[in-house]
Amino acid sequence: MANMRVKFPTLVLLLGIVFLMAVSIGIAYGEKNAIKNHERPQEREQEERDPRQQPRPRHQEEQEREHGREEERNREPSRGRSESEESREEEREQRREPSRGREQEQQPQHGRREEEEEWQPRRQRPQSRREEREQEQGSSSSSGRQSGYERREQREEREQQQEQDSRSESRRQRNPYYFSYERFQTLYKNRNGQIRVLERFDQRTNRLENLQNYRIVEFQSKPNTLILPKHSDADYILVVLNGRATITIVNPDKRQAYNLEHGDALRLPAGTTSYILNPDDNQNLRVVKLAIPINNPGNFYDFYPSSTKDQQSYFNGFSRNTLEATFNTRYEEIQRIILGNEDGQEDEEQSRGQEQSHQDQGVIVRVSKEQIQELRKHAQSSSGKGKPSESGPFNLRSDEPIYSNKFGNFYEITPDRNPQAQDLDISLTFIEINEGGLLLPHYNSKAIFVVVVDEGEGNYELVGIRDQERQQDEQEQEEVRRYNAKLSEGDIFVIPAGHPISINASSNLRLLGFGINADENQRNFLAGSEDNVIRQLDKEVKQLTFPGSVEDVERLIKNQQQSYFANAQPQQQQQREKEGRRGRRGLSFPFRSLFTKLLSTIM
């Protein structure tokens, strides 16, 4: 009992202490709310003004409340603390900073930039009375911080841009012979169509220096549209890849119009004024042109007689006196009829009740049905079968393909058969590879081919040799390098002379090729039953060249019975066929026995 008497007062004392602690916690919680709601209005207003800030986690709010309570104690009359106490307080605050940084790193990466902007001002809050006084100096310091934020954002944008440039540079280094659809630059664009040009070939690598004077131009237009007359300081070889077109070529003494369809090609000499019409009511027009500049290697310019929002008329370049003497009339009349008003708008009385003028539309304009009929009235069609003419259009598939089997077709018009491209030393090829087909490995003896993906998807593998400088530094690595890429419509790739290449189609693939330096070019296949240079080697040379025996080499070479085109996955197809036959045999017996048992039960 004595022990019970001793323990009972102790128990009462402990309960009293617990009660006092609970009351203290409640008071402290109320103080924290008061600090949050009353002592930090500036921070709350800043948060309301900045919509980018996200809701803060609870552990950050508790740390901020603790920091606010410490600041409140600093503002109380008992601020006459010693410098040692302030230094200890600053040390404790500095020790909290690494933990805050770790907690910030543990948060999700989504919205990282907004979180950094939310986190940064907290690290800049005054942590001593000296910093508090500096903060109270006025708006000059806040404007300085704002400029610091802007500089930080600009620096981040520059770093992101540099990272993107480095990634694109690395892609170019991986395969400098491949140009995706996005590598085109837009020259003109409006709601009726666009004109784009591919970046220069020699900007990718010095291995394509011989292509510095060749550019690829693409023209697309919607139905019932016309590209306004112009001439250029470049020779063109244009090919229609989609839709129909009517092109009119204007010379000093005559005008000639031609109707073009898919696969039709035409030589357009430099300085020739021309305009292209899309007469179709439903189908878009797509034309690809190989440009060979005359004045400046790699650069060419289009000259328009009309003024639009995209460009000025070349008549604008002449002086007033020259124009008046040229047209033998007043300048105001010339400006009204040819140049248009200086502000690029028609008079209000002229524009009222009329359709949108061609000056507002740009270089690609809409045309009416009546205008289309007049433009096509005297147009001629392509030459069809046979050798291309000296002036008119010709079709790339007019003759029989030079290579053909069930997996694909290969059409080619060489310079000696094409009077229009003979002086340019350019050949034209059109390749059709059926789905699952493979254009067998081969190389060109002297021609450089620029290939445009007309339709379909696939991939190609190009074999090259490392640079001699790299070979000296990396002698332990192989010299041969494979360049490969996935192909889709609009992509472009280059096949240098002497570089073996193979192309396979994951869907029906159509390719247009421009052969540069194509005169007397020879195509050498490395596999297949025909035109196989490996097959023509002497047996003694085969024995010295390959590690296998002569018999094994001969058997391997003769194993491919197709020529030019073949099945891209013959082994997989054979395996699937075997599994299919095995599956049919395995399923036939159970079904037959089950059917027999069912009949016996019925009988």
UniProtKB/Swiss-Prot annotation:
Glycans are attached at residue 504. It comes from the Eukaryota. The keyword Glycoprotein applies. Residues 36-177, 343-363, 375-399, 564-583 are annotated as: Disordered. Residues 36-105, 148-172 have a biased composition (Basic and acidic residues). Residues 177-335, 394-554 form the Cupin type-1 domain. One of its GO terms (molecular function) is nutrient reservoir activity. Keywords: Allergen, Glycoprotein, Seed storage protein, Signal, Storage protein. It holds the Pfam family Cupin_1. Transmembrane segments: none annotated. Residues 137-147, 381-393, 564-574 have a biased composition (Low complexity). The keyword Glycoprotein applies. Disulfide bonds: none annotated. Residues 1-30 form the signal peptide. CDD domains: cupin_7S_vicilin-like_C, cupin_7S_vicilin-like_N. Component of globulins complexes which accumulate in seeds. Seed storage protein. Accumulates during seed development and is hydrolyzed after germination to provide a carbon and nitrogen source for the developing seedling. The variability of the residues taking part of IgE-binding epitopes might be responsible of the difference in cross-reactivity among legumes. Belongs to the 7S seed storage protein family. This is Conglutin beta 2.
